[in-house]
A protein has these predicted regions:
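Preference for protein termini
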Residues: 1-197
Length: 197
């Protein structure tokens, strides 16, 4: 992934977070928009039922913490797409990847954030341990193993959860309140989630 593309994805992350928060708070629009998806997917329908019930009863807690993972791909336009104004304005002489496309916005994403930390460390290790085997990649990164972006989620996600707990207590919530992790039976990612403990 080119550094400029990675930095663009990092920069846009907070904007996607704000957009997601605004969408989540517009429950009437959200329910209407996802109605057809719920009819075709039992899990989505159950989430919509929970949301409708909570919305009807009224939120008892105004504080919310969203741990989101947004997955992107770089799209290299076809020749036909390159002729469209969107691409010709951006492209110049470069015919490489032109735009990010969001593949998924995962709202149940606490565990994989921590896995990203470990993946970053793995990439740094492999590049430093086997430089000859990864010469092309090291050249693309320009700084070899030092060019791999660090990932601090293993520290940041638990700090975010702790900050949400602290804010809850400061707003009058019970100081004995606990953070509960709900893990479904047979969850394949339970080991990943334990990184947050």
């Amino acid at each position: 992934l080119p550094r400029a593309a990675f930095e663009a994805a990092v920069a846009i992350g907070p904007l996607f977070g704000k957009l997601t928060d605004a969408v989540a708070r517009d429950t009437e629009w959200l329910h209407k928009t996802l109605e057809a998806a719920g009819q075709g997917d039992e899990f989505t329908e159950r989430l919509l039922e929970i949301s409708r019930t909570v919305n009807k009863e009224g939120l008892g807690q105004q504080l919310q913490l969203g741990i989101l993972r947004s997955d992107y791909m770089l799209h290299k336009p076809t020749e036909a797409e390159q002729k469209l104004p969107l691409f010709t304005e951006q492209a110049g002489a470069d015919t490489g990847p032109k735009q990010f496309m969001q593949v998924e916005l995962n709202c149940i994403a606490s565990s994989f954030g921590c896995m990203g930390h470990l993946t970053s460390q793995l990439h740094q290790y492999l590049l430093s341990r086997y430089p000859a085997e990864s010469a092309a990649l090291s050249a693309a990164l320009s700084n070899g193993a030092d060019g791999v972006a660090p990932n601090h989620n293993l520290a940041r996600l638990p700090k975010g959860i702790a900050a949400a707990h602290s804010a809850y207590v400061q707003q009058g919530g019970s100081p004995d309140a606990v953070v509960v992790f709900v893990v479904q039976d047979g969850e394949a990612n339970s080991v990943d989630q334990r990184l947050l403990e």
